[in-house]
Amino acid sequence: MKVTLIAILTCAAVLVLHTTAAEELEAESQLVEVGMPDTELAAVDEERFFECSVSCEIEKEGNKDCKKKKCKGGWKCKFNMCVKV
């Protein structure tokens, strides 16, 4: 009787540990997926910075006031940079 009880408790403990480990792996995989767009956004930010500053520099060479290039998607050109509004 004691052996059966020990076997049942052991199986229950293994099941709990296995479930916990599976949940941790799933959470880690979701964190990795969430982190991926950040690197893509950084590349977009660099492109916006470059486009905005180049646009202003070209207009300054023509002895005109810098009409800053419009940055789209909640961004605006300020100090030759696209900044988040």
Swiss-Prot record:
GO CC annotations on file: extracellular region; host cell postsynaptic membrane
Subcellular compartments: Secreted
Pfam families xrefs: Toxin_20 (PF08089)
Predominant localisation class: secreted
Signal peptide from the UniProt entry: 1-22
Keyword Disulfide bond listed: yes
Distribution of this protein across tissues and organs: Expressed by the venom gland.
GO molecular function, one term: toxin activity
SUPFAM superfamilies per record: omega toxin-like
Function of the molecule: Postsynaptic neurotoxin.
Name by which UniProt lists this protein: U4-theraphotoxin-Hhn1m
Organism: Cyriopagopus hainanus (Chinese bird spider)
Lineage: Eukaryota, Metazoa, Ecdysozoa, Arthropoda, Chelicerata
